[in-house]
């Protein structure tokens, strides 16, 4: 099927749905809901198809005007100018149309659970977790997103073994999902007298936040333990059993939550993280089974994959998946100026998907 005939088919489908929805009495409730959903999904695509068809029609009309022997010189020159402008515009509109045809990730509009954990490198890795945490906070502020800290485990001297956040707002998961993976830092620690460069790492996991209605967890699959919360060094910071550890027996996933003074709040936060991890586990299994989807991903999608290096002496950040190097480390780390990196990753992902669509 040619590109243009495929567009005609989509348009026909859209107008059939529109006609159906104009008289909902002939549809069952379920059919009406499904038709409405499909109509809403096609609406923005049809808008771009109409724009593409209009540009093509204008080019054709102008070509006929230019080729017409009876067209006077002044009008012909004006037509030529407009014709060349539209010729330049057409590839951009076609690219925009192709992007609108790409399969959508249904999780893109969701909020996200962001988990940052120290990897190799001891205290330096823990300090790097704090740096990444602050970077994402700054980025979220720029996007007017809401941040809720779910859990944190500090080292007591400025570092964190791990931090978990819930980030809420517009298209959060779409923007943050490519941050999952191993982030590596190269810098000279303040305590390093010889000035030797150290390499440390932290792992970032970005999970779509899943509502309770979207994923039901059977209570009998859970083991819930409560105990007193502890601070750096293991000292008790609470006199009541407010900390909660939930084990999902079938998967072996364990979630610990102790930031809140209330056991009830800790349990709710732990269940929120558990839902996200279970959903992510199923999603990874699904993706692994679909080779085409794997080909369209940036990098391998493996959480153990090294995705980015932050080199402080050179003020350099390199994203290894797209071979992009920026010499703006301070802007990115301290100000959360991540847009250039994130937009480049999104563009690469779209380019890969376009290749797979073969259009």
UniProtKB/Swiss-Prot annotation:
Top-level taxonomic group: Bacteria
Primary role: Peptide chain release factor 1 directs the termination of translation in response to the peptide chain termination codons UAG and UAA.
InterPro entries: PCRF, Pep_chain_release_fac_I, Pep_chain_release_fac_I_sf, Prokaryotic/Mito_RF, RF-1
Species name: Ehrlichia ruminantium (strain Gardel)
Annotated protein name in UniProt: Peptide chain release factor 1
HAMAP family from the UniProt entry: Rel_fac_1
Entry keyword Glycoprotein: no
Molecular-function annotations in GO: translation release factor activity, codon specific
PROSITE patterns hit by this protein: RF_PROK_I (PS00745)
Modifications after synthesis and translation: Methylated by PrmC. Methylation increases the termination efficiency of RF1.
Keyword annotations of the record: Cytoplasm, Methylation, Protein biosynthesis
Family: Belongs to the prokaryotic/mitochondrial release factor family.
Gene3D superfamilies, A to Z: 3.30.160.20, 3.30.70.1660, 6.10.140.1950
Ranges in a coiled coil: none
One GO cellular component term noted in the UniProt record for this chain: cytoplasm
Principal location class: cytoplasm
Residue numbers carrying N5-methylglutamine: 235
Compartments where located: Cytoplasm
